[in-house]
């Protein structure tokens, strides 16, 4: 086929069109606009000038200053408070405190840096999809050049096995079969002819053609997908929760600091009539204690460790977590957007029961279709037909001679065969209408074939016509082979399980609407499948979609004829309607939506770009692993929620007891070192909460901050009352000579130790209350890991207080009294927690109730009590 000649139509500015108009306008106009000559190509000088104008054919790298990136991790409410505490420690010379606080800050920064580095890998994976070398005509000769040196207007040759190096319009050649499944989601290679567009990053499976480059770098289909990935990304709900909690505690701490400073300055200037450097240092120390007490410094680490242990459990079930926050977000996912090809289906064509036209035996239709196929071609249709042959004797004894591969013009394949007796037979297979033309059947005689094809299309099947001839002239139409990409064996059950967990499943596919509807019917989805190009505005902005479009997205069971920008917009639309969205996929075309989704899931066999953009990567085929992931996520979420309630309540207790002791007794009830020890002892059991026995919610669960803060505040208030009463009792003992002597509480330093012991014992007993919404003495019981950690830390704190390690020693009697007092308050707080939950349940509709006990702990050898 000869090259296309140029015409004299108006030009289109290639720099302004970014390749999009050049994909649509007539081919002669493309050549004229790009000043491209298919017979000579560009000169070296022209290529160099265009390279300078349009840039390299590569995805640009965004360079980030490492120092600026690290400094970015040191911002935020919790980080600011940690830094403030460290600065105050340095000012007053408390270098031990400074070292401990700085070490915690460094740990959190390192963890953030590691997580952020993983986020940049999506673009790197997309770059790997680009071709490395290309055959280009320069100065009238075919030469090999690096793909990143290709420019718009270059004449490029593509052939079997090559990766298309740039978006190009094909200008000459017979045909090419191009696999663009990773880009568009189409399950079969697409036949290309002169004038068609070949996408950058797609793979040539058959044929050889020549094209003119119309888009490079970010101006290609692949490049625009990469740009979407770069701009995608949702803020972690765990981060939002930590910021909310941090802000709540910081505001409270600032108020308390102001109150304390005013009181202390008043006492020094008005009452004592003096305020020297020593007073200022003491005041700074007081501020330091309050700041350290107000900061949940271990909260980011505890969140990460809890989710990391959950990630280990998920990996054993065939799901690898690339972004830890996705675990808790999976717990709240209420909408699952699933790619069809290779995710809900096997991505393998399968032949259905043959439809007979003139043949009398269905096996004959399969037999002659197989004889018109080649196993070595790699063609998925040939593979499916050959796999449909269950009896090898059907095709034995035949020798394939001449073979004419698929021709996009005739739309069929022909083979000349010789049987064991030396007879020649011709076989053909192809589009049903093409086989009709080959057999010469027309008019009413062709109606049965047309009707069968229409019925198959309505059910989502592709149709393959089969014919034979003894002389190559007179052909007999044997029958039609229905072909489909069948659903995975577990797809229907997985979708049913997902619905039981409160998830709405939506199918998203690049295939035609009829195919999508049939697949939806087979796997138990609804059949409200909408064509994406009809649903979305032509020049849509995903951030400002019409309300009507959002309504459509919410109500639809799935979308057909979907392109990357549609998938991305579907996720955005659902998120704008307050849905937590999980998106599954396996191709480059899925990457933007995978990254934007609250929990992107790359299924088994996904390309690198999809795996890098996803938060969860499945190593086993199908979606069944997602059900296990959801259960695990909801367990972990329950544990994190329990920790959050505990941490806020205990922090309130510590902050207010410091203020109360200072205001009412003129005593700082805790030293900074004591607070650091409390923090360490409290977080040891928390690290084992990842192994705790909890319950699974049958519905999606989210961060309900008003409820969490309400429960935390109420428990915190009663914990403050508990601690304040014990401080009052201790103060009374201290000022009663007989009690003071008998119980060994002889000075304010011992009183500080008493408060320290009460907070550690009471705090750990409080953890047993916050770990469940039900009565703390009923199932599920604490795991042996959590219980062992609590017992171990209690032994440690008793030894610290009994032997006077780091603190003045307490008597055995005082330690025993402290334990008895806290056990009594544990019962009181347990009643308060249960009554609070019942009251909140009465006020809150649509609450996710925890009803199912977890029977499988994180590790196989661990068992619940």
Place the predicted regions along the sequence by residue:
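Non-lumenal N-terminal regulatory segments of integral membrane proteins
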Residues: 1-151, 156-164, 169-177, 181-247, ...
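Helix-interface capping motifs at the ends of transmembrane segments in multi-pass membrane proteins
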Residues: 80-100, 252-295, 312-318, 651-674, ...
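Hydrophobic alpha-helical transmembrane segments
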Residues: 92, 96, 100-131, 236-335, ...
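Conserved beta-strand/loop elements of the cytosolic catalytic core of P-type E1-E2 ATPases, chiefly
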Residues: 107, 111, 141, 214-217, ...
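Basic, amphipathic juxtamembrane/active-site segments
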Residues: 177-179, 184, 346-366, 521-525, ...
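Membrane-embedded transport module
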Residues: 260, 306-309, 527-583, 597, ...
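Cytosolic catalytic regions of ATP/NTP-dependent phosphoryl-transfer enzymes
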Residues: 329-477, 483, 496, 505-524, ...
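C-terminal transmembrane module of polytopic membrane proteins
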Residues: 733, 753-865
């Amino acid at each position: 086929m000869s090259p296309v000649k140029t015409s004299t139509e108006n030009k289109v500015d290639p720099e302004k069109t970014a390749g999009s108009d050049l994909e649509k306008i007539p081919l002669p106009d493309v050549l004229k606009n790009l000043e491209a000559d298919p017979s000579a190509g560009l000169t070296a000088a022209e290529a160099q000038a265009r390279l300078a104008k349009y840039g390299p054919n590569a995805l640009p790298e965004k360079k980030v200053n490492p120092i600026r990136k690290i400094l970015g991790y040191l911002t935020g409410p919790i980080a600011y408070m940690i830094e403030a505490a460290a600065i105050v420690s340095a000012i007053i010379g408390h270098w031990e405190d400074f070292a401990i606080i700085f070490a915690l800050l460094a740990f959190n920064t390192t963890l953030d840096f590691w997580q952020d580095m993983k986020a940049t890998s999506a673009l790197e994976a997309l770059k790997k999809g680009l071709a490395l070398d290309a055959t280009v005509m320069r100065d009238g000769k075919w030469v090999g050049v690096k793909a990143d040196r290709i420019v718009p207007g270059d004449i490029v040759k593509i052939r079997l096995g090559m990766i298309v190096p740039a978006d190009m319009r094909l200008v000459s050649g017979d045909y090419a079969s191009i696999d663009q499944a990773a880009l568009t989601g189409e399950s079969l290679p697409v036949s290309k002819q002169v004038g068609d567009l070949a996408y950058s990053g797609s793979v040539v499976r058959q044929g050889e053609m020549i094209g003119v480059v119309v888009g490079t770098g970010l101006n290609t289909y692949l490049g625009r997908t990469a740009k979407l990935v770069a701009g995608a990304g949702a803020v972690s709900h765990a981060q939002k929760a930590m910021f909310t909690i941090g802000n709540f505690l910081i505001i409270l701490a600032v108020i308390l600091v102001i109150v304390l400073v005013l009181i202390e300055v008043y006492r020094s200037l008005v009452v004592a009539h003096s305020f020297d450097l020593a007073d200022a240092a003491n005041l700074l120390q007081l501020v330091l204690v309050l700041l350290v007490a107000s900061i949940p410094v271990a909260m980011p680490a505890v969140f990460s460790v809890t989710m990391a242990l959950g990630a280990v459990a998920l990996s054993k079930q065939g799901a690898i977590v690339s972004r830890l926050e996705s675990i808790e977000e999976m717990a709240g996912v209420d909408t699952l957007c699933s790619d069809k090809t290779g995710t809900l289906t096997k991505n393998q064509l399968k032949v259905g029961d043959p439809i007979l036209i003139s043949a009398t035996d269905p096996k004959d239709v399969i037999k002659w279709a197989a004889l018109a196929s080649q196993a070595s071609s790699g063609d998925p249709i040939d593979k499916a037909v050959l796999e449909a042959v269950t009896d090898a004797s059907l095709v034995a004894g035949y020798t394939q001679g001449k073979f004419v591969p698929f021709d996009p013009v005739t739309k069929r394949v022909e083979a000349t065969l010789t049987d064991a007796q030396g007879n020649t037979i011709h076989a053909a297979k192809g589009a049903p209408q093409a086989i009709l033309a080959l057999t010469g059947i027309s008019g009413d005689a062709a109606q049965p074939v047309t009707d069968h094809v229409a019925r198959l299309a309505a059910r989502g099947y592709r149709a393959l016509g089969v014919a034979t001839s003894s002389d190559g002239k007179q052909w007999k139409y044997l029958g039609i082979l229905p072909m489909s990409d069948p659903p995975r064996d577990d797809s229907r059950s997985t979708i049913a399980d997902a619905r039981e967990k409160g998830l709405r499943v939506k199918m998203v596919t690049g295939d035609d609407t009829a195919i999508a509807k049939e697949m939806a019917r087979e796997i138990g989805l609804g059949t409200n499948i909408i064509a994406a190009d009809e649903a979305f505005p032509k020049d849509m902005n995903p951030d400002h979609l019409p309300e009507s479009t959002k309504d459509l997205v919410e109500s639809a069971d799935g979308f057909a004829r979907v392109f990357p920008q549609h998938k991305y917009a579907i996720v955005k639309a659902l998120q704008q309607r307050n849905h937590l969205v999980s998106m599954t996929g396996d191709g480059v075309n899925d990457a933007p939506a995978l990254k934007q989704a609250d929990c992107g899931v790359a299924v088994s066999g996904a390309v690198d770009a999809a795996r890098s953009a996803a938060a969860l990567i499945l190593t086993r085929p199908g979606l069944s692993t997602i059900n296990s992931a959801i259960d695990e996520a909801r367990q972990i979420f329950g544990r994190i929620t329990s920790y959050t309630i505990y941490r806020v309540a205990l922090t309130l207790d510590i902050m207010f007891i410091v203020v109360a002791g200072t205001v009412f007794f003129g005593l700082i009830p805790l030293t900074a070192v004591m607070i650091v020890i409390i923090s360490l002892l409290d977080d040891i059991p928390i690290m084992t909460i990842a192994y705790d026995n909890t319950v699974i919610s049958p519905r999606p669960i989210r961060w309900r901050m008003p409820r969490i803060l309400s429960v935390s505040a109420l428990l915190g208030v009663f914990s403050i009352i508990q601690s304040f009463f014990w401080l009052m009792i201790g103060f009374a003992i201290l000022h009663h000579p007989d009690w003071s002597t008998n119980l060994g509480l002889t000075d304010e330093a011992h009183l500080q130790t008493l408060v320290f012991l009460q907070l550690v014992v009471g705090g750990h007993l409080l953890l047993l209350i916050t770990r469940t919404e039900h009565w703390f003495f009923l199932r599920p019981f604490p795991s042996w890991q959590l219980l062992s950690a609590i017992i171990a830390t209690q032994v440690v704190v008793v030894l610290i207080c009994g032997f006077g390690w780091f603190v003045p020693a307490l008597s055995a009697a005082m330690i025993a009294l402290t334990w008895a007092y806290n056990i009594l308050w544990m019962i009181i707080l347990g009643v308060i927690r249960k009554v609070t939950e019942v009251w909140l349940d009465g006020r809150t509709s649509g609450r996710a109730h925890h009803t199912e006990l977890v029977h499988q702990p994180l590790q196989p050898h661990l068992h619940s009590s």
